Amino acid sequence: MKRVFLFLITNLAVILVLSFSARLLGVDRFLTSNGLDMGMLLAFAALIGFGGSFISLLMSKTMAKWSTGAQVILRPSNEEESWLLNTVRQLSKKADLAMPEVAIYEGAPNAFATGPSRSKSLVAVSSGLLRSMDRKQVEAVLAHEVAHIQNGDMVTLTLIQGVVNTFVIFLARVFAYALDSFLRRDEDESGSPGIGYWISSIAFEIVFGILASIVVMYFSRKREFRADAGAAALIGDRRPMIEALRALGSLEAGKLPKEMAASGIAGGGMMALFSSHPPLESRIAALESAR
């Protein structure tokens, strides 16, 4: 959850900054000087949309360390840190990956992988997870995160987010232009759009961005199933991953809802649409039915 949530928040912030900068530079005024140029607007939306998404990808590892306070293990100071490094190294070798950075952070049972590429990645695990699971279960969680890197999930998420951003920016300006034209219908429409266009385009970007995250989260849930299967393949046994998921369920049952969400325990109803992880029982069932 942390990996996807941080990416989405960073992406939204970058998109808003780029959009605001474009307004200051007069790009929006150029696009609407003679009515709304749909072709130019689509090109602009794609440039900002994919640009913002890839900037977010490049910032992902730094943002993850900063936001969680994760401490990268450069030289192991105890047996547990040595075991973590060796386990990730072995899993990465099996996955034919360069050794990622390994970090520990304080928090509820959780782990995540992030980074701009397969060769520049980070695997982080919380102190809560290390305290509450046995090593076979922790190894399964680490294998799950290494599988995310092996599958190129951050790059895939970036491309999906780029497409989503493009449509969000495009539609936000189309709706804002239509709203501004309606509000100024009794005025001289020969000039550039009024202040209503600038304000409403930002509002539409935020609203459409939140709604569009449903699409991103849908693909994220699909990638979780694949990472679970990848973890089972790396370990050579699906049972440790199943036990790790069951442990997460028993640890979080009846506890803090936010911690449950962070660990991938999805709620029902509308909230399930905004969850980056499928329900644990669905993930366990998928592993148990795999051959």
UniProtKB/Swiss-Prot annotation:
Membrane-spanning segments: 4-24, 38-58, 159-179, 199-219
E.C. numbers: 3.4.24.-
CDD domains: M48B_HtpX_like
Chain coiled-coil ranges: none
GO cellular component terms, semicolon-separated: plasma membrane
One Gene Ontology biological process: proteolysis
Cofactor annotation: Zn(2+)
Similarity-based family: Belongs to the peptidase M48B family.
Protein name, per record: Protease HtpX homolog
